[in-house]
Amino acid sequence: IIYDEVHLLPAPIFRFTADIQSRRRLGLTATLVREDGMEGEVFSLIGPKRFDVPWKEIESQGYIAPAECVEVRVNLTETERMLYATAEPEDRYRYCSTTTTKRKVVEALVERHVEDQVLVIGQYISQLDELSEVLGVPLIKGDTPIKERERLFAQFRTGEIKCLVVSKVANFSIDLPDATIAIQVSGAFGS
């Protein structure tokens, strides 16, 4: 049995597949990180890790595009800082990820890279809906029909669409080699 995106295996919807009888199991993933901290469950379900390749090595071999990562710090307004300070600890990641100030920074970055192929990637659907509307660009999320996703990705690849807003659905088996800028606005562990 070959499990692609094996880090998903501990989820109830996939976990039952670990009960399928097999002499050999192979799990593949780009990153063995889970928001719920259940990474160790993967090994108990399919066995120990046998092979690990650092991403820089894969990059140097040409299997993935080289990336230059830049952190853009966003200064919250006084009101936003106060709301953050009084928020419940479990709500702070989401709050910082979805502030108006951050949205304005994303708008400025997209404007600055208007000639590039830009992906705006995020975790929170309401934030992505707002960004799609404000930027005037399409959004691909879980409820986007497969045919529509394929059409939008094809238009992005050809340059007909210069910017796409995408949810986590774009994390899985999507090859967008023409993307030159990725803006991560929110994620499972904050932003």
Language model: regions and residue ranges:
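Conserved Walker B
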Residues: 1, 5-7, 169-170, 186-188
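Post-DEXD/H (motif II) to motif III coupling segment of the RecA-like Helicase ATP-binding lobe
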Residues: 5-71
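Short, high-confidence coil segments that cap the C-terminus of an alpha-helix
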Residues: 22, 115-116, 160-161, 179
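Conserved SF2 helicase motif VI
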Residues: 31-32, 181, 188-191
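Switch/connector loops and helix/strand junctions flanking conserved nucleotide-binding motifs
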Residues: 34-38, 173-176, 190-191
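Conserved interdomain hinge at the start of the Helicase C-terminal
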Residues: 79-133
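Conserved helicase ATPase core of P-loop NTP-dependent helicases/translocases
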Residues: 117-121, 126-174
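A short beta-strand element within the Helicase C-terminal
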Residues: 165, 172-187
